Amino acid sequence: MGLHLTVPGLRRDGRGVQSNSHDTSSKTTADISRCPQHTDAGLQRAATPGISRLLGISSRSVTLTKPRSATRGNSRYHWVPAAAGWTVGVIATLSLLASVSPLIRWIIKVPREFINDYLFNFPDTNFAWSFVLALLAAALTARKRIAWLVLLANMVLAAVVNAAEIAAGGNTAAESFGENLGFAVHVVAIVVLVLGYREFWAKVRRGALFRAAAVWLAGAVVGIVASWGLVELFPGSLAPDERLGYAANRVVGFALADPDLFTGRPHVFLNAIFGLFGAFALIGAAIVLFLSQRADNALTGEDESAIRGLLDLYGKDDSLGYFATRRDKSVVFASSGRACITYRVEVGVCLASGDPVGDHRAWPQAVDAWLRLCQTYGWAPGVMGASSQGAQTYREAGLTALELGDEAILRPADFKLSGPEMRGVRQAVTRARRAGLTVRIRRHRDIAEDEMAQTITRADSWRDTETERGFSMALGRLGDPADSDCLLVEAIDPHNQVLAMLSLVPWGTTGVSLDLMRRSPQSPNGTIELMVSELALHAESLGITRISLNFAVFRAAFEQGAQLGAGPVARLWRGLLVFFSRWWQLETLYRSNMKYQPEWVPRYACYEDARVIPRVGVASVIAEGFLVLPFSRRNRVHTGHHPAVPERLAATGLLHHDGSAPDVSGLRQVGLTNGDGVERRLPEQVRVRFDKLEKLRSSGIDAFPVGRPPSHTVAQALAADHQASVSVSGRIMRIRNYGGVLFAQLRDWSGEMQVLLDNSRLDQGCAADFNAATDLGDLVEMTGHMGASKTGTPSLIVSGWRLIGKCLRPLPNKWKGLLDPEARVRTRYLDLAVNAESRALITARSSVLRAVRETLFAKGFVEVETPILQQLHGGATARPFVTHINTYSMDLFLRIAPELYLKRLCVGGVERVFELGRAFRNEGVDFSHNPEFTLLEAYQAHAGYLEWIDGCRELIQNAAQAANGAPIAMRPRTDKGSDGTRHHLEPVDISGIWPVRTVHDAISEALGERIDADTGLTTLRKLCDAAGVPYRTQWDAGAVVLELYEHLVECRTEQPTFYIDFPTSVSPLTRPHRSKRGVAERWDLVAWGIELGTAYSELTDPVEQRRRLQEQSLLAAGGDPEAMELDEDFLQAMEYAMPPTGGLGMGIDRVVMLITGRSIRETLPFPLAKPH
C-alpha cells in the first residue's frame, strides 16, 4: 500500500542556511512507501533486518508504527456511521454514473425506479442530487450530527409517505409490495439511526443551517436564470411557456417532476449543464452545512501564561516546547492543568505542534482531551514534530507514527573547531574573521527598544517571502517583551553594521533552540558558521549546555544512501531527495547541520489513518506557511477570546492576562492537590501523619525546629545518679498509654531507655498531649530527672518535652523489623534506626578503619591521597569504569588501584606511605564483591614481602581487637537440632602466628602430585583436566597455576594463611624471587575462602618493568579488558630509581567481613543495589 505524504519543511527558518544566495526557502516533499514488512515492534523498526540489509535501507530511514489501541469503536453501534455513509455513497455513485452514461442509466433503470419510488430519492440524470448525496455520505462517515439529522428526516418523511399510500389503498399487488417493503426498511433505518445517535458526535459551525439555506437560495436563483437563458437560446422541441419551469425543475427540483409533464425536450447536453448549476448551488450549501467547526487558532493571555508556567516546571527536556507559545495556535489542557497540547485547524485537520507541554505523567490525559476535541468537531488528528517519547504517547492513544527526520543538537561542552572533521567549519570561520566580522550575543531583555525595532526591520527585509513561515519549530514573532529570555546573536562588520542574526528561544534554563536565521546579501561566506561557532564556544559563560539547530528532513536517507555498499533502494531514495532538493533544500539543510557534528535526535509525524495522510500533509504545508490560502489570517495579530485553561487552574488567580509566566511556586502548590490521577498518592498511615503535621503547624508548633545539644546521651543518662537532671534526645520506638501515665521507649545511638510521662510531674500539658502529637518514629527531646518506675526499671521522669522531628512514615514492624535483605540495603537509614545489629556493624567498621590507621601511624607511615580519576587504568588487572571529561574531551577511568601513583611518591623519597580510600572495579556483585570498595595500599622502603607478613597480621589482629574487644573473628555457623535450623555467629581465635605456604606446595597437596615452577604447560593442562579445572588455550604455565590455585587452594582455605611465591607471569609489578627461578616475591592472605590482601617485593628495575607492562598493553590491545595499559609517565618516574620497597594491598571491606562474620553488603553502609 503506497502512502503519498507531503511534508512541510519542519525547521526554524531555513532561509539562514549558508548557500550561494543570501536567502533560501523551505519546502519538503516526499513520497514514502509503506511495505508489508513494517511492524509495530517499536518506533525504531521499519523493515525486517534481512530485507533492510539486502536493499541497503536502515531502520532509521523511514519509520512507520501501528497504534496499540484505537480511540473509537467501543460502542455496539460504532458501525452505524460507516454503514449509512457507504449506503448513501453507493447511491450517489450510481446516480452520478447514470447522469453521464446512458448505458448505465439503461442498465440500472428498473432497480433505480424501485428505489426511487419506495426506498430513497434516486432521480434520473441529476448531478445536483448526486453531489448532495456524496457530501451527505462523507458527512455521515465523518459522524456529523447534522448529517444524521438530515438522513433521519428523509427516512421519517419517506416512511410517512409510504404509510399514507398503504392507508389509501387501491394499489396493485406490485405497488403494495413495494410500499410495504419500503415502509419496513424505513422503520428499521429509523430505529438504527436513533440507536446510533451517540455515534454522530461531530459538530458543525453555529448557524450552519441558515447559512446553507442562504447559499443554496443564491446559487439556485443564479442557476435558474442561467439555465432559462440557455433554453431560450437552444430550446430544442421544448414549448416556450414551459422553458422556465423545465429549467427550475432541472436545477432545483432534482428532476422530481416527470419529464412527460413537459411538451418536448431540449438537447440532452443541456440537461447535464442544468444539473451542474444545481449541483454547484447544492454543493456550496452542503459544504456550508456540513463544514466542521473552525478553531480560532489564537491563544488568550491566560492560555499563554499557563503554558509558560508548564514550561518553567516541566519544559527542560523539549527543545521545541517554547514554540508552544506561538500565538496563532489554540490549546487544549488536561483536566488537571498539568499538561496541554497546542494545535491549529487547517482543512479539517487538527494539527498538534510537537509534544504535549507539561508533566510527562499527564501527557496521556492531554492527548485524550485533544482527541476528544477532534472527535467533537469531526477533525482529523495529526501531529508534526513529536519526539520519540511524545510519539510513543500518541501511539499509545491510537495514532500511527512516521519518522520525518532529525533535529540537530549541539553540546557546547563537546564542541571544538579542531580536528579533521571540523575542517570545513574552521575554514569558513577563518574567512569570516578575515573579513573583519565579530559576533555579539545578548538576551532580548538587554536590547533597547529602538535597537530592537531596527532588528525587526532587518529581519523582515532579509526575508524572501511575503509571510513569516513556521509552525511547530518557529515562534512567529520578534521583539515581544514576553520573550525577554530569548537570545540574539549578531554578526557585525568593521563598520559596526549588522550583517546576519540568529534568534534563539529558551530550552529549559540551560539550553536554546534556533528560531530565526537571517543574513544580508552583503554578508561574506562563513558568516553563519562564525555565529554558530562563537555561540557554542562561549556557551558556558551564558549558562548554555545545549543548542538546538535546524531540522533535517529524511536525514538518515541522505546519510545511508551515500554510504559505501548502500543498496539500490537506498541509493534511489537518496537520488530522489537530491533531485527535489533543487527546490526544497532538503540536502542543503542536512549538510548545513551535519558540518557541526551534532547529535541527531529523531522527530516524528503522527496520524490516525493512512487515508488522512494527504490531508495532514496539506494542513502542515498551510500551517508552516508554504501554501497561503485566500482570505488567510496568517499575518494578522492573533488574540484569543475564550481561555482554554481548566477552571480549577484559572480560579487560583496565578495566571496573568498579559501572557507572562505565573509564580512557579504557586503552581507547585496547586499541582500537589489538583492532580488528575498524577498527584502524589500516599498510603493511609502516611496521610494520617501528614494531617497531624498540618494540625501541629496550624497550632503554631514547629515540627522541625532548630536543634540544641542534649546534656546526656541515653547511655550517660542511664549511668547518671538518681534524681540527676538530664535532657536526652532520641527516636520514639514504643509507646504504652495508661491514661494519666504514659511510658515510651527512647533510642539514640548510644542505647535505649524508658521515659515516663506523668500528668502530675509535667510542668505543662498532660500525657495525652504527647500521645496526640507524636507517633512511633518521631524525634523528641526529653527533659527531667532520673528515677525508676514502680517495677524498678530505670526511667527518665519527664517534666518537659519538645518535638524535634516529625516522622511522616511508619517504622517497620517492631517485632520483625526489616526482613528483606534488598529492603535493608535500599533503606539503610531505616535499618539503622530499628536494627541494633546494623548499628553495631557501622561501629565495628569505624573501629577497624581507625585501628588500621593508628597501627600504621604508630610505625611512622604517612597517609596520602592520590587521584581517583586516572587517564590510564593500571596498578592491577581488572575491568575499569570509564567516564568522560568534557573540558579536555577525553575518557577517564575510575581507579582500580592507587599503586602506580604511590610508587611515584616512593621514587620521590616518601619511604613509608599508605592510602586508605575507594577503588572501583567493573566486575561482579556477590557475597564478597562490590564494584566500589575500600582499599588499603601501603609501601615501606628497604623492605620486602616477608616483612609485610607480620605487618599485615598485626593490622588485622589490631582491627579485630578494636571491633570485638579481642583478636577474634566471627564465623557464621548453622546448627541443626530437634527445634530446627539455627543460624548464629561463632568466635574464632585469630591471635598468634598464621601459617605460611608456597603456592606450588599447596597445589601439590591438593592434586596429590608434585608440581613446581619448572612443571611444563602440557603437564599442567593434564592436571587441570584430571581435576576438572577450566583453562584457556592461550594461557601460559603461570596463568594455569594461578587457576589451579584459585580452584583448589584458595576456595578451600579455612584459617588465615599466607600463600607465597606466585608465578612471575601473573605478577607484572612484582620483582622476581631472589633465589627461586620462575616465581615472584608475592604472597596472598586467604581466610575462609576469601582473599584478604596481597603483598609484593616491588619490581624496581625500570627496564624489566617496561617489558612486562608492554606485554600487558599487548593483551589490552588484543581485547583483554582487564589488562593494564602502558603508563609512560610511571615508567619515566621509575627510571629515576625507586628504593627496594615492599608493598601491601588489603581489602578493608573483606577484613570487616572477617571480623564481623557478615557479607560485604551488610558491612557497607550503602552497597550498590539493583535498580527497581
UniProtKB/Swiss-Prot annotation:
CDD domains linked to this entry: LysRS_N
Positions with a binding annotation for Mg(2+) 2: E1091
Region (Phosphatidylglycerol lysyltransferase): 1-663
TM stretches of this protein: 80-100, 122-142, 146-166, 177-197, 214-234, 272-292, 612-632
SUPFAM superfamilies: Class II aaRS and biotin synthetases, Nucleic acid-binding proteins
Polar residues bias spans: 17-31
Binding site for Mg(2+) 1: D1084, E1091
Catalytic activity, EC: 6.1.1.6, 2.3.2.3
GO annotation, cellular component aspect: cytosol; plasma membrane
Lysine--tRNA ligase as annotated region, ranges: 664-1172
Cofactor note: Binds 3 Mg(2+) ions per subunit.
Family assignment from sequence similarity: In the N-terminal section; belongs to the LPG synthetase family.
Function, as annotated: Catalyzes the production of L-lysyl-tRNA(Lys)transfer and the transfer of a lysyl group from L-lysyl-tRNA(Lys) to membrane-bound phosphatidylglycerol (PG), which produces lysylphosphatidylglycerol (LPG), one of the components of the bacterial membrane with a positive net charge. LPG synthesis contributes to the resistance to cationic antimicrobial peptides (CAMPs) and likely protects M.tuberculosis against the CAMPs produced by competiting microorganisms (bacteriocins).
Comment field (misc): There are two lysyl-tRNA ligases in M.bovis.
Protein name, per record: Lysylphosphatidylglycerol biosynthesis bifunctional protein LysX
